[in-house]
Amino acid sequence: MGSKGAYRYHWQSHNVKHSGVDDMVLLSKITESSIVENLKKRYMDDYIFTYIGSVLISVNPFKQMPYFGEKEVEMYQGAAQYENPPHIYALADSMYRNMIIDRENQCVIISGESGAGKTVAAKYIMSYVSRVSGGGPKVQHVKDIILQSNPLLEAFGNAKTVRNNNSSRFGKYFEIQFSPGGEPDGGKISNFLLEKSRVVMRNPGERSFHIFYQLIEGASPEQKQSLGITSMDYYYYLSLSGSYKVDDIDDKRDFQETLHAMNVIGIFSEEQTLVLQIVAGILHLGNISFKEVGNYAAVESEEFLAFPAYLLGINQDRLKEKLTSRQMDSKWGGKSESIHVTLNVEQACYTRDALAKALHARVFDFLVDSINKAMEKDHEEYNIGVLDIYGFEIFQKNGFEQFCINFVNEKLQQIFIELTLKAEQEEYVQEGIRWTPIEYFNNKIVCDLIESKVNPPGIMSILDDVCATMHAVGEGADQTLLQKLQMQIGSHEHFNSWNQGFIIHHYAGKVSYDMDGFCERNRDVLFMDLIELMQSSELPFIKSLFPENLQADKKGRPTTAGSKIKKQANDLVSTLMKCTPHYIRCIKPNETKKPKDWEESRVKHQVEYLGLKENIRVRRAGYAYRRVFQKFLQRYAILTKATWPVWRGDEKQGVLHLLQSVNMDSDQFQLGRSKVFIKAPESLFLLEEMRERKYDGYARVIQKTWRKFVARKKYVQMREEASDLLLNKKERRRNSINRNFIGDYIGMEERPELQQFVGKREKIDFADTVTKYDRRFKGVKRDLLLTPKCLYLIGREKVKQGPDKGVVKEVLKRRIEVERILSVSLSTMQDDIFILHEQEYDSLLESVFKTEFLSLLAKRYEEKTQKQLPLKFSNTLELKLKKENWGPWSAGGSRQVQFHQGFGDLAILKPSNKVLQVSIGPGLPKNSRPTRRNTVTSRGYPGGTKNNYPMRAAPAPPGCHQNGVIRNQFVPPPHAFGNQRSNQKSLYTSMARPPLPRQQSTGSDRLSQTPESLDFLKVPDQGVAGVRRQTSSRPPPAGGRPKPQPKPKPQVPQCKALYAYDAQDTDELSFNANDIIDIIKEDPSGWWTGRLRGKQGLFPNNYVTKI
């Protein structure tokens, strides 16, 4: 019985199940219902990301998803959007690359309601940018601060609400600053409207800020003793809402993360202790209660004064005095006098709460300031901004804080509308682009209702006016505000009032605000008495948190909380408008916070108010990309010689020349007055792909030239270092002691089937096909790869079942981390056999390039372990076998390899039971060293004398390897030994093991540079239009006359390539199977001179046949 779920594929594999559409621009029907249905399909299949053009839609999965690891970072780094499934890494990579290439600041605006996943999205962006950007220790320090700022600010600024277990109760705009090279070398955080009232009051079922619970759960016994920490229900402020624990939050572990974050950011341990003292002091402050004595407030139990006074470094009596009374200044007849006013119980509670809120807010500002100082740089160059701000929220009772939060979200929605709907359509008109307008709701009318100054004044202006005229009056101010609102804006279509407050018709729906406390919270005044109290602290750190000049601050009207948030919101909008914006629209699928729970009506509501339908319609009817002519030319100039390095003519004509050079259909773009507009993303991807290929081609040329320069410069040094490993310990081969080191003997660049086993960015130091001997001493071929981290042995096996049954595929046989190698054993003779010793079992290998391999392995081993690689030389070697649980050779065991003096330069292997007998003739003395006279000079000639042939054998064609010994098909004739050069060549042919040629080839690097190979990069959906363009743009050949007869066979001798060959040096030819090569000169060494595609060079004659 077959199982439906038997085959489980990775979400990004080519055979992955498709779920809905990746980009909702491709939806066949554009309705809210079809959008919701597509999102639901993808969400249920764990696809949380979907595109609308370049806008990313993210649905909160309420669980950890598996696709945020190193594999995905490598997959999305440098990739075009269409290459991989939708992902937040694709957006982050686009921001990073555009910043570097276009030299423009970028920002991402993450919006959505509370609990939709905005904070997590921001973390993923910051984490991705940190992982893909380079840099040294200083840059790494900045990266650490960027990443560690998250847990620190979350501890002091996030809390559990009824809608979100980790809700941001503040907004932040995080600018990551970069050097011109793309390394993060600085940063800056701007924070907005911390909801400090949460310290003293909150809705039932919610918590205060995480740090209070972290301290109680995670403090050490000594800290608990010194800070007076006990159970959570002991503290009045925490017991208000009756919620202490959260299912998916570990307060004890998070406390350690918070302390670690403070260490990374550079907050001294003394300051950390004082920060925790203040946190504990706030909790103890809340336990001070008041009773009424003769209409005035008195502290109910004075013993509760002692601990907060001690923790805050203030006098206990002074604390009592400032909580129950206040100094008021009054002016009468030009004279000023202070009046001592005793407070009632309600006023005393308000004063206590005001001090607690102020302490938490000042500590939070200190932490933000500490982070900014740790990342500060002298001057700004480029930056990526990440906006993570509290989401739109509606509670049972919505007060002043919700009013401000929803106002900021209203402003963010206005930015989105301005830049994606309104501005885009207006731009088409300004640029003279053919366009059909699309209707949409512009929420500017709601923003004006809240923030307008005049005609009519907005809610915030009326609120400030009431606070100014009734600044000395506490009672009745809120009702006066409601009356003024009803009188001045009561007829506004987006405003309604009720007996205890008012309603605003926000873009996300109607919200009812309770007027209670509106004016008091808007005033946000910290009484001078409390500032004086904290300035009297014996602790300099606490004093520094209250730097006010009391005499100067008495003059002028204090700034209200509403005007502050309005200014901050408008400053934020100005900052965002200066950047190239990117958007993430977060959707909350349910209120249960459980995975796979889908509330259709809730999601549909969000889809409607986020304007996704209109966004799809504008994107579908409009142009995916627009750019100023000059910027477009600057980015794509490299595509043609006429535009590179600079276009001399009219910019518009230059843009047209570039688009025509890539054969882009005229209906895929329009040229406006100052910008180019490209319709389909595929057309843009075509340009990007060709640009990347151009840069890649030039980079390869530079890289190749540089590598050759470095290789030649270090050639002698490398050979001598390698030779030192074997000096006085092992005989050397005559024909390999002076040879060049190439490293890659199997052409890894053209071997994706081997590259799959190695990390994408892992450098391959050495690659060769070696012989590996098993427990019966039977030799099999293995590809040996060495990287800075690991050693790989790769074999081949036939697939035994499935659709690929019978196909031979590469299989990873062994992977050994470099530091796990115990030692390497070799004989003292000139053979090529060595044993890799590892804890589990050993590997017996044979490679003609053993000296080069061992020298590279020794370097990597020393880098990893700071020790020398143990090399053992003996003519009797022990081999530990792998344990197996079947067959006659089970239970592991060991084998022995014995070496004897024989004849000739080829090793003769004779297995006998558990011993392998190896005999070989004498080689060069053990004290032999490389000589400089045979080294390759800068022109590639031995000893400075011109020689047109490589210093190695012509490679053997496929199928010429038998039992680990190479049998060359080419045998030089006897007269070839007559001159020294040919004699030397023949010795190499009989001795050295060349690279293993491939049966099939994807083509050499040369072919990728020819114009023909660019045909496949055309826009995929051109179809008939492409054919029409080709037929209309050029006349029929020779006016339609019949082709002439082909030319007679040339007199120059030619040969046909039997196999593909990749050049190993600059004077060699690369060719593919079936290429026709002109033969210029034949040589008995096996290396002929020929000409192919205008290039003359050497090639191995056993790879071709004459025609």
Curated annotation (Swiss-Prot):
Residues 19-692 form the Myosin motor domain. Residues 695-724 form the IQ domain. Disruption phenotype: No visible phenotype at birth. Mice exhibit massive proteinuria, combined with the presence of leukocytes and hemoglobin in the urine. They develop enlarged kidneys, present damage to the glomeruli, renal inflammation and fibrosis. In the glomeruli, the thickness of the basement membrane is increased, and podocytes fail to develop normal foot processes. Disulfide bonds: none annotated. Residues 979-989, 998-1012 have a biased composition (Polar residues). Residues 581-591 are annotated as: Actin-binding. Residues 730-922 form the TH1 domain. SMART domains: MYSc (SM00242), SH3 (SM00326). GO terms for molecular function: actin filament binding; ATP binding; ATP hydrolysis activity; calmodulin binding; cytoskeletal motor activity; phosphatidylinositol binding. Residues 1034-1051 have a biased composition (Pro residues). InterPro entries: Ie/If_SH3, Kinesin_motor_dom_sf, Myosin_head_motor_dom-like, Myosin_TH1, MYSc_Myo1, P-loop_NTPase, SH3-like_dom_sf, SH3_domain. It is found in: Cytoplasm; Cell junction; Cytoplasmic vesicle; Cytoplasmic vesicle, Clathrin-coated vesicle. PROSITE patterns: IQ, MYOSIN_MOTOR, SH3, TH1. ATP binds at residues 112-119. This is Unconventional myosin-Ie. It comes from Mus musculus. The gene is Myo1e.
